[in-house]
């Protein structure tokens, strides 16, 4: 990670850390880096989620892009993966999404996609950071006909919706409950599933700029669980603020997380001979039960660090077409270049329809070990150095010895927030509580700032 770019673009509290001034510079410098080898006038797509700060940052970012002669196509409110899809399929030089994903409304972020639809590599981010840190802005300042042109492009959203519908199968009145997190999916999910013929119940569809991810969406699926049971829906589908994640709910109101979603899709593709190298790419956060289910099914796995960018890197390097995270990022490389919650939802309902099985039946093949994750607020500088603290290192080693191989512990820094994450898995909830609570007590005493 660099000075400005984290694991998922530039993020911070809007107007305090991620300021309009910084957004202008990111537009100007990022646009220049991503388009300097273009022979024709470069075109960049810009999208945003529903945060109150989105239009402020969008205006500043767009001004920066226009100032270096880039034509900007403004997409409005739509999902992050829609930006990636449109960049790749419509020949744009780059795409930019203004969103802080699952974070609360006070935060926002800016992430770039290259002309291939993939998030930027470390080298491109380093080029942009070097320009941000330069003492003087020496980039070209064209005037008159050299300036970029701003185009409103709402049809981009319709194209994305149509594409997702084309990957699915008619649902013939299947009862589906949606939770669009008062976020980006609020402009598209209802239309997509209506076009597929589903009978819909929708919550989290009234964004006001402040309620994105607030007690709704993939990080707060409790409301959707109740709606599924009350409405008699066959499935509930919860997206996060920018709709790059999906958490599902089965007909009984039980959670089906990213691990189970990956398993269901992976098994389906494997049976059809369509799972590249019969392998799923996952991260160190995936549950032991997920790994055991893959072993029983004879499906291989490749394991990466936490973060969908690392999953995508491994998929591109080795030619895999399915990967993801327990949190609900699922990358279906045959369809898009990044995690796409609505695409995953369309594929999940297609599998239910084609197999004739309920979601609970499909998910039952993965027995999830009890898992507990606790986030501890620490100074940003300390989250990377936690494992160097002797007391923290010692307590983790002690807990791992007690587990004797029947469970696991993972302590890692958040890529986007000043948090240290402590996770444990074990056969019983009592054991999990003991391991996590023991470790977090030591971490808080040593470096916590709560």
Curated annotation (Swiss-Prot):
Modified-residue entries (Phosphoserine), positions: 101
Residues binding Mg(2+), per UniProt: 101, 240, 242, 244
Catalytic residues (positions): 101
Pfam families, sorted: PGM_PMM_I, PGM_PMM_II, PGM_PMM_III, PGM_PMM_IV
Keywords from the UniProt entry: Isomerase, Magnesium, Metal-binding, Phosphoprotein
MF GO annotations: magnesium ion binding; phosphoglucosamine mutase activity; phosphomannomutase activity
EC id: 5.4.2.10
Modified how: Activated by phosphorylation.
InterPro entries: A-D-PHexomutase_a/b/a-I, A-D-PHexomutase_a/b/a-I/II/III, A-D-PHexomutase_a/b/a-II, A-D-PHexomutase_a/b/a-III, A-D-PHexomutase_C, A-D-PHexomutase_C_sf, A-D-PHexomutase_CS, Alpha-D-phosphohexomutase_SF
GO cellular component: cytosol
Highest rank taxon of the organism: Bacteria
Signal peptide start and end residues: none
Reactions it catalyzes: alpha-D-glucosamine 1-phosphate = D-glucosamine 6-phosphate
CDD domains assigned: GlmM (cd05802)
Cofactor: Mg(2+)
GO terms (BP aspect): carbohydrate metabolic process; peptidoglycan biosynthetic process; UDP-N-acetylglucosamine biosynthetic process
Note describing how the cofactor binds: Binds 1 Mg(2+) ion per subunit.
Purpose of the protein: Catalyzes the conversion of glucosamine-6-phosphate to glucosamine-1-phosphate.
Family per record: Belongs to the phosphohexose mutase family.
Protein name: Phosphoglucosamine mutase
Annotated source species: Streptococcus pneumoniae serotype 2 (strain D39 / NCTC 7466)
Organism lineage: Bacteria, Bacillati, Bacillota, Bacilli, Lactobacillales
Gene name tied to this protein: glmM
